[in-house]
Amino acid sequence: MKLFIVLVAGMPGAGKSIVSKAARDLGLPVYNMGDVIRMETSRLYGIITPETMRETSRRVRKLYGEDYVARKTIEQIKEKRGVIVVDGVRSLVEVEVFKKYAETVILAVHASPKTRFERIRKRNRPGDPDNWEDFVKRDLTELQFGLGNVIALADYMIVNEGSIEEAYRGAYNILKKLVEKNAKDNSDS
Ligand SMILES: Nc1ncnc2c1ncn2[C@@H]1O[C@H](COP(=O)(O)OP(=O)(O)OP(=O)(O)O)[C@@H](O)[C@H]1O
């Protein structure tokens, strides 16, 4: 069985965690690229806050290259087989790193800024922006990493403007089809 990577991309609060939930329910391993930053943040700052996370994010890219987070994620997954999900890809440079190791597709989750802002406010995650200006600032930081390009080149798109159940069903069906396709491709070859 070959490795097949589903790269999940979306702006903050778009609903990427719904895709992770659907993946876990299908028994697929999920890797979060944010975990690499979380580990580096503890190493560099000894404390994890949204500010130290953001600073680490910028710092490691500058020090070790735009592809660093993807390379670190690859170290964890390259021995894996079958369909896996990687949450949080942010640039085409990162996409290229994954493409070298396996067949990949990009699954994007989209919701309008207004919807994302309302949902972020409700989820009450520490460090989330609580006003429109900070929300826009965070969006721009993500876009500077190149996230907009990844979303523009997505193979699949979930528009998450309806209910959570609807988005979950969309994600579940896409992932299930990919699992079936990968199984078929492997039995053919
Ligand atoms: N369709 C929906 N209806 C209502 N609430 C939703 C919907 N989709 C997501 N949410 C809620 O909106 C919030 C943001 O979603 P989620 O945390 O999945 O976003 P994310 O893309 O993982 O964000 P980040 O990149 O910031 O981690 C969560 O509290 C989630 O439960």
From Swiss-Prot:
It comes from Staphylothermus marinus (strain ATCC 43588 / DSM 3639 / JCM 9404 / F1). Keywords: ATP-binding, Nucleotide-binding. Belongs to the UPF0200 family. ATP binds at G10, M11, P12, G13, A14, G15, K16, S17. One of its GO terms (molecular function) is ATP binding. It comes from the Archaea. InterPro entries: NTP_hydrolase-rel, P-loop_NTPase. The keyword Secreted does not apply. This is UPF0200 protein Smar_1234. The keyword Nucleotide-binding applies.
